[in-house]
Amino acid sequence: MELGLFTCGYQRYPLEQAFEDAGRFGYDYIELWGGYPHAYVEDLSLTGVREVERLVQKYHIPVKCFTPEHNAYPFNYMTGDAFQWVRSMNYLEKAIELTAAMGASKMLFSAGHAGYRMSVQEIDERLQKSLERLVQKAEQQSVTLILEPLTVYESNVITGLNDLERALDKVDSPNLDRKSVV
């Protein structure tokens, strides 16, 4: 079994501190949080990817998973109008590309709250459409997606293993991880 350090808790430190601590405490890899100031998708230019690569080389700790910050406005693909959905999809597709560019093999994401006006059928259709599009991009980039359940306070879409299993059954792809759900 390998243990990874999730960098979200380091958002008030330089990213290098997370790598340094991961090495010092014996972690096997980094799960890179895609939030400001370290690796926010829209700011993670080629220079940002190079900085992550420099830290990987310096500390000999790979980034195995990228977790882009999303689900809050404007990047929640489960709510809003068509423009917000497209914007959210573009954002997550860029995150998949950055995952591959950093040499990470996995990207963790979740389904945000769908609001209180959508029917169960509308939620299911939007989720399936979203997963199909993201999986297609992941297949092109050789990235495995991990879909994370959220709490009932964060989402009304996937909040437990039964919801997760139904979601995973909607899209058949080796790039949508079914093993990391427990």
What residues fall within each predicted segment?
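Glycine-rich tight-turn/loop motif centered on a GG-T
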Residues: 78-85, 116-124
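Conserved beta-strand positions in the central sheet of alpha/beta enzyme cores
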Residues: 31, 65-67, 108, 146, ...
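Substrate-binding cleft and catalytic face of glycoside hydrolase catalytic domains
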Residues: 64-74, 108-114, 152-156
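Active-site groove signature of glycoside hydrolases
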Residues: 99-120, 141-151
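Acidic/histidine-rich catalytic cores of soluble enzymes
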Residues: 29, 36, 125-182
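Glycine/Thr-rich phosphate-binding loops of Rossmann-like dinucleotide-binding domains
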Residues: 40, 117, 155
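Residues at alpha-helix caps and immediate loop-helix transition turns in enzyme cores, especially N-
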Residues: 14-18, 44-48, 119, 123-126, ...
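N-terminal pre-domain/capping segments
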Residues: 1-104, 132, 139, 173
